[in-house]
From Swiss-Prot:
Belongs to the KdsA family. GO terms for cellular component: cytoplasm. Pathway: Carbohydrate biosynthesis; 3-deoxy-D-manno-octulosonate biosynthesis; 3-deoxy-D-manno-octulosonate from D-ribulose 5-phosphate: step 2/3; Bacterial outer membrane biogenesis; lipopolysaccharide biosynthesis. Gene3D superfamilies: Aldolase class I. It comes from Bradyrhizobium sp. (strain ORS 278). This is 2-dehydro-3-deoxyphosphooctonate aldolase. The lineage of its organism: Bacteria, Pseudomonadati, Pseudomonadota, Alphaproteobacteria, Hyphomicrobiales. InterPro entries: Aldolase_TIM, DAHP1/KDSA, KDO8P_synthase. It is an enzyme of class 2 (transferase). GO terms for molecular function: 3-deoxy-8-phosphooctulonate synthase activity. It is found in: Cytoplasm.
Length: 287
């Protein structure tokens, strides 16, 4: 059975190819960059898993969580300390790296050390930020704002492609549904693919976030990550975005919605099976 999602140009980041009808790719890593040692530990573990499963992997982490609920919350190592770590992960492990940018002034410098610049959902309509990211020529992954309809992403993506950069990914990460709650409308995946012409990614961990749900921090329901991820992959997406951590309950941010690293490989095996079915691959490709 062919996937209902529209084909799109293939976007390449390092050795990873994203396409709505290509085999599933994964973007994974901890929410924020906690230390060099922690980053290399998690990146190495993820590379081993990806190699065993023969799945393409981009490592993600954030140098600055600039939109934390509380002003006193941990934000990450910051730009100066993080860029050498990103470069080391790329050179020593051979993994493409993704990180967020929050201001137009950051884009050119960050682009020297990573493969994908990510635009946070809250900032997805900030034209100057989008244009600065586009100007780097790097792949730009735009998170759909929790306040946007899926078809509204067409204008967002057009700002980047109109600036001469065709290397865009569009990511669904849930839509606001009342206070402290997000829901995922799986119709948005084929709608975004059709209206933006971009490979579509599903963010399975931020989609179960409960924004501000713990007063001074966001809550989450990580037990529903596999449920939503399976549903999205069954539609037929280019990739999944999954935050993972060796000890989520003691992570400095987004712990309630991150997948424990020990459970990550099992989840990926399941998603690869769903992906093979959704994209009409031979049954013997499912294992």
């Amino acid at each position: 059975m062919n996937a209902p999602i529209s084909a799109a140009p293939v976007v390449t980041a390092g050795s990873v190819r994203f396409g709505n009808q290509l085999p599933l790719a994964v973007i994974a890593g901890p929410c924020q960059l906690e230390s060099r040692g922690h980053a290399l530990e998690v990146a190495s573990a993820l590379k081993e898993i990806a190699t065993r499963l023969n799945i393409s992997l981009v490592y993600k982490t954030s140098f600055d969580k600039a939109n934390r609920t509380s002003g006193s919350a941990a934000r990450g190592l910051g730009l100066a300390q993080s860029l050498p770590i990103f470069a080391e992960i790329r050179s020593s492990l051979g993994l493409p790296v993704l990180t967020d940018v929050h201001d137009a002034s950051q884009c050119a410098e960050v682009a020297q050390a990573v493969d994908i610049l990510q635009i946070p959902a809250f900032l997805c309509r900030q034209t100057d930020l989008l244009l600065a990211a586009a100007a780097t020529g790097k792949v730009v992954n735009v998170k759909k704002g929790q306040f946007l309809a899926p078809w509204d992403m067409a204008n967002v993506v057009a700002k980047i492609t109109g600036a001469g950069n065709p290397n865009v990914l569009a990511t669904e990460r849930g839509v606001s549904f009342g206070y402290n709650t997000l829901i995922s409308d799986m119709r948005s995946l084929p709608i975004m693919a059709k209206t933006t012409g971009a490979p579509v990614i599903f963010d399975a961990t931020h989609s179960v976030q409960q924004p501000g749900g713990q007063g001074t921090s966001s809550g989450g329901q990580r037990e529903f990550v596999p449920v939503l991820a399976r549903a999205a992959v069954a539609v037929g997406v280019a990739g999944v975005f999954i935050e993972t951590h060796p000890d989520p309950d003691h992570a400095p941010s987004d712990g309630p919605n991150m997948v424990p690293l020990a459970q990550f490989e099992g989840l990926l095996r399941t998603l690869m099976a769903f992906d093979a079915l959704a994209k009409g691959q031979a049954a013997d490709a499912i294992r």
